[in-house]
């Protein structure tokens, strides 16, 4: 019993715990840093990353959305509102496609439900706004997002194709 007390006292007076912690700190001090200097450096994004919403167009310029309203029905947050009208050729197209980004939970159900890959969640995660009204996306804003991110969205969908 007395031997154990001497060992504890020796460790205490020789600052054993202090030097053990100092050694651990030095070990990690010389390793490469794991943090990034955001916004100057950005980490890689997965092809499955779900960011800002976008509506896509076909290569001929026609919008892909066929107004089936599956995305509106499956949205658990009820963030999507769609109005549609039939066209002269018998097909339907949306007249109103709104997403309330303040309600959206970025679950990706809308993207999974869409039979024509019209609504997608793009790679953009930096869409801070100054007013709440800017977070209500209408059809034009969504189509603009789709045009801006089309190359990256198409690449991500192609990379994700084996898993769908």
UniProtKB/Swiss-Prot annotation:
Alphabetical UniProt keywords: 4Fe-4S, Cell inner membrane, Cell membrane, Iron, Iron-sulfur, Membrane, Metal-binding, NAD, Quinone, Repeat, Translocase, Ubiquinone
Compartments where found: Cell inner membrane
SUPFAM superfamilies, per the entry: 4Fe-4S ferredoxins (SSF54862)
Binding site for [4Fe-4S] cluster 1: 65, 68, 71, 114
Keyword Cytoplasm: no
UniProt cross-references to PROSITE patterns, sorted A to Z: 4FE4S_FER_1 (PS00198), 4FE4S_FER_2 (PS51379)
Residues that bind [4Fe-4S] cluster 2: 75, 104, 107, 110
Reaction catalysis annotation: a quinone + NADH + 5 H(+)(in) = a quinol + NAD(+) + 4 H(+)(out)
A Pfam family assignment: Fer4_7
EC number of this enzyme: 7.1.1.-
SUBUNIT field: NDH-1 is composed of 14 different subunits. Subunits NuoA, H, J, K, L, M, N constitute the membrane sector of the complex.
The protein, known as: NADH-quinone oxidoreductase subunit I
């Amino acid at each position: 019993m007395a031997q154990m007390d001497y060992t504890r006292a020796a460790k205490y007076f020789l600052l054993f715990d202090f030097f053990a912690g100092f050694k651990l700190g030095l070990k990690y001090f010389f390793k490469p840093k794991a943090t990034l200097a955001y916004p100057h450096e950005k980490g890689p994004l997965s092809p499955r990353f779900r960011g800002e919403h976008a509506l896509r167009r076909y290569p001929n310029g026609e919008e892909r959305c066929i107004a089936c309203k599956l995305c509106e029905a499956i949205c658990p947050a009820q963030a999507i509102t769609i109005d549609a009208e039939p066209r002269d050729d018998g097909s339907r197209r949306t007249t109103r496609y709104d997403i309330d980004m303040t309600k959206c939970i970025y679950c990706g159900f809308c993207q999974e439900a869409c039979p024509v890959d019209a609504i997608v969640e793009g790679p953009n995660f930096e869409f801070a706004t100054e007013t709440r009204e800017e977070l209500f996306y209408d059809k034009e804003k969504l189509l603009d997002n789709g045009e801006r991110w089309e190359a990256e969205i198409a690449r991500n969908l192609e990379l994700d194709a084996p898993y769908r």
